[in-house]
UniProtKB/Swiss-Prot annotation:
Keywords: Ribonucleoprotein, Ribosomal protein, RNA-binding, rRNA-binding, tRNA-binding. GO terms for cellular component: cytosol; small ribosomal subunit. Belongs to the universal ribosomal protein uS13 family. Residues 97-121 are annotated as: Disordered. Part of the 30S ribosomal subunit. Forms a loose heterodimer with protein S19. Forms two bridges to the 50S subunit in the 70S ribosome. This is Small ribosomal subunit protein uS13. GO terms for biological process: translation. It comes from Parasynechococcus marenigrum (strain WH8102). Transmembrane segments: none annotated. Residues 100-121 have a biased composition (Basic residues).
Amino acid sequence: MARIAGVDIPRDKRVEVSLTYIYGVGPTRARTILAQTGVSPDIRVKDLEDGDLQKLRNAADDFTLEGDLRRQEGMALKRLQDIGCVRGRRHRMSLPVRGQRTRTNARTRRGARKTVAGKKK
């Protein structure tokens, strides 16, 4: 397996698809990296030459990827929570952040239902 940005990318897939295994690289960024390096998106990783792999590594280093990106996102969430803004409080309470309704729905964000005893008649 070839290693780019500290990630083993699959050898048998096309380069364009293999690059998306790196956290922070989606289809668009993968195409951008390939365009910068001049590597064909249709070639398989196992068929790449060492020079091409090195070009891909250097191009990937220009972006914030993997651990650094995860750390940045975590720090951004922590900052929102520390300043006490609405978005930070909603993150802390595990509720939807962007104004969605919560009286019904929002089950993914709120978690499994907690059964509450009904009123006796």
